[in-house]
């Protein structure tokens, strides 16, 4: 789980995206919380990001789906964390309409620090090319109304993109976007 503060902004904020990227680089360079292997950490110069762009900051319509049943989310390993679909986001990007599902980790939601945290995994047409093949994640807070800001500039790779010892949630097929999201972290290395 990404440890930098999640955002709850309603307008594009270049500084917020820059802070997120800087925090990722600081975390990954450090010994304590880095998902990198020791060899990669010793040679780490910083993550490769797409250029920050206001184009990839969208205000989505939020619809709560409160009748969803908890389920075990598939991961890259044997672990099966229990999630619940929390809601749906609909938005327009480059003149096309899209929908993404938001999820809540049941165990994490019981902890004070994460009681209002939601998980937004997605894949797109850059996945496997310029970005990690398994998709990327954005951490968000439960919205207070019927809209939510999505800043794709703050998208990050799952830990398993850097180190195979991690077990990461696999992006559900419903969250595969038929568009290039040229924002956030690029793939680490081949």
Model-inferred region functions:
Residues 10-58, 63-67:
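Start-of-domain marker
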Residues 14, 156-190:
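Extended, aromatic/histidine-rich regions of cofactor-dependent oxidoreductases associated
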Residues 54, 94-98, 146:
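Short acidic/polar mixed-charge low-complexity motifs
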Residues 62, 102-104, 124-126, 152-156, ...:
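A mature extracytoplasmic/lumenal domain signature
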Residues 66-133:
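Mid-length scaffold segments of soluble, non-membrane domains
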Residues 119-156:
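Acidic, glycine-rich flexible loop segments
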């Amino acid at each position: 789980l990404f440890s930098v503060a999640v955002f709850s902004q309603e307008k594009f904020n270049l500084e917020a995206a820059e802070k997120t990227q800087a925090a990722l680089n600081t975390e990954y360079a450090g010994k304590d919380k880095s998902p990198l292997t020791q060899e990669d950490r010793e040679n780490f110069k910083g993550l490769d990001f797409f250029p920050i762009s206001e184009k990839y900051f969208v205000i989505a319509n939020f619809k709560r789906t409160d009748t969803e049943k908890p389920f075990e989310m598939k991961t890259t390993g044997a672990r099966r964390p229990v999630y619940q679909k929390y809601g749906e986001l609909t938005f327009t990007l480059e003149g096309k309409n899209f929908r993404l599902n938001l999820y809540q980790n049941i165990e994490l939601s019981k902890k004070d620090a994460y009681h209002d945290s939601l998980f937004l995994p997605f894949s797109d047409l850059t996945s496997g090319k310029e970005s990690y093949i398994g998709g990327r994640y954005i951490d968000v807070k439960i919205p207070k109304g019927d809209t939510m800001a999505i800043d794709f500039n703050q998208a990050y790779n799952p830990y398993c993109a850097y180190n195979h010892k991690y077990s990461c949630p696999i992006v559900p097929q419903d969250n595969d976007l038929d568009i290039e999201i040229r924002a956030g972290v690029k793939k680490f290395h081949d």
